[in-house]
């Protein structure tokens, strides 16, 4: 799917996005899509899944990746070096409620442990950490733990993506 409808019903084309995410309610999120400002965009496929409607786009800061759960969006703002938390109960008017700087300030990926409300982040840079953040209260974010693989043997290991599934972390490194 390349063609979308804006709020006025006009068609436009998105040819490039870094990531696409679909939440539990079926909304589509584009991250790093130049045509919608390189932040994140929310699309509603409920009327026509072949031509979803753009209902919101945040076109300020570059958003490399998002993870959504229970009306909360967690965003990896790569160049700002933070993850941000957004209240998206009203998908047409999300509200940024918090952000947190990560250790190596190049926040590439975010993924939530849904049971414990722990957000895992990875900074895509040499020797960086995978960090675990308690986001149960977005107004009081606390770092719980961190992990680095093989740093003593090879300081050039770079964490790329981190995913949480069934009490395990799956991390790609290069």
Place the predicted regions along the sequence by residue.
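Feature marking well-ordered beta-strand scaffolds used for ligand recognition
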Residues: 1-174
């Amino acid at each position: 799917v390349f063609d979308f409808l804006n709020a006025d019903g006009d068609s436009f084309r998105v040819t490039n996005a870094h990531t696409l995410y679909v939440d539990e309610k079926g909304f589509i999120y584009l991250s790093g899509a130049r045509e919608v400002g390189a932040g994140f965009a929310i699309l509603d496929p409920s009327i026509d899944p072949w031509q979803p409607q753009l209902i919101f786009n945040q076109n300020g800061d570059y958003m490399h990746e998002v993870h959504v759960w229970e009306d909360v969006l967690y965003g990896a703002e790569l160049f700002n070096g933070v993850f941000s938390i957004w209240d998206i109960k009203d998908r047409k008017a999300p509200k940024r409620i918090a952000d947190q700087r990560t250790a190596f300030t190049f926040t590439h990926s975010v993924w939530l442990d849904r049971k414990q409300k722990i957000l895992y982040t990875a900074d895509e840079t040499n020797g960086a950490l995978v960090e675990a953040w308690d986001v149960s209260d977005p107004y009081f974010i606390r770092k719980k733990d961190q992990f680095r693989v093989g740093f003593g043997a090879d300081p050039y290991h770079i964490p790329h993506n981190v995913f949480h599934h069934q009490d395990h972390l799956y991390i790609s490194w290069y």
